[in-house]
């Protein structure tokens, strides 16, 4: 029996196949099953073009058999089989695809896409085997042939006996090494898991004889093992079924089967697109946040299938980061894959699918907000933070997509409201969208800075997430209305008369404020009369783009650079405390320093900032109480 050499620089190419193209050894089973599916597809195609042939679906299947004792794994199919010449051409020439040639020579009917295109999948068998045998009998032929290879040195082909047409691949599984455990590819559980993972939606049954137990007939307390044939794969994926025939329970069951979460999805999206690129997709918006969602360990992405075969567990390129919470699958026959089918080539089709999915998710969320407000608010409680990160990231380039999905607590409505709802209620004389920042709604309601805005009857949005103000800085405005913090220097609510009064107060008490500023040198940029305070004696305002709350967030980060906002100490001229300040300035400079330090530290505490010297602060309080 003559040993023939592989063509196409066999040794180097086969070594490349085994060591470089595939990153996961378990992929071999996916590739061999896909080849078997292609072989059955070819039989089906012949029945479409030859009226004398009938396609009885029950006659066509793929069988996987494990023989642990002899370290043999078999993958058999009832497909079209191969002649001697086809064995020579398809298996003797690495990177020649019989399926691709079949597709070129025949117009494959819609609904039956032949998977193979590179002619390399078969050689993934050498990832787990160093002795590969193929026994095949071509449809319509009386002759069968056996192809065998032990690696890059070559292969043999000889006649053999085989009753039915089809192909059987026999792998002699490698022995274990220190680095690799090959025994697992003989275990029923592992084989079943790999089939479910990669080939669950192959359209033909993938059968295995599984070991089970039952009570012995003569002794019910003892159990015996027996074999039972099972079809491992689901075959018809839910995304290819008619949406009108599916119920909510079907989607919820699929969500649970895929282990997307322990909750029920708050919304599912089933879409089928035909056009420049065709695909089916089922997307789920979870109800609750995964435990690791806001950690670097979380990996976004959708399951990606090509013609029902899993290509990627999580294709991150299909989802923008701000929609990274979405779970689901995409299946398309139009994708450009690399030679191993493990890595997707970044092409126009993928980008188009991703763009469509992004738009679909946005539209569904807007619909949920409009029609099922309670559900949306529950979703927003879990994932609103991610949407705000989306506005902040990439220098605000996504703000137009996300701004109408944002919600904040309202001082007026005492509930979450959208920016559109806020703007729709603004009085004609209101120039800005006002917001206040704090650790909680309760803390914000007690802020001195909020008094003046509420006194005007204006609505204030409460920002309690550390990302809120950063996101708004990127948003800048909404429907031509700028955002304004209640702690900012100029609130834009003072009338001309009040403005003049305030300026007059600053001039009249210029020397007092200068003295206080000197006492607080390096701590505040200025001391001035307040235009916003009603009942509180003092507060801190900020000048510039960096707010006091942003300072707190940035300085809480690792490797912070002790960033400081420009602070202004504002004094309520109508409060009794101011009278004490004036008296101290006129008669007791030491007492003025004491009062100034106390008021500054009081303002720091109101803002949730640490005071520099707590001991001195408490001693100063004691001095006043003497």
From Swiss-Prot:
Region span, B: 342-552
Disulfide bonds: none
Role this protein plays: Molecular chaperone. Has ATPase activity.
Biased amino acid composition, Basic and acidic residues: 498-509
Record region (C): 553-626
Pfam families membership: HATPase_c_3, HSP90
HAMAP family: HSP90
Keywords: ATP-binding, Chaperone, Cytoplasm, Nucleotide-binding, Stress response
Name this protein carries in UniProt: Chaperone protein HtpG
Cell location: Cytoplasm
Family membership noted in the UniProt record: Belongs to the heat shock protein 90 family.
Gene Ontology molecular function: ATP binding; ATP hydrolysis activity; ATP-dependent protein folding chaperone; unfolded protein binding
GO CC aspect terms: cytoplasm
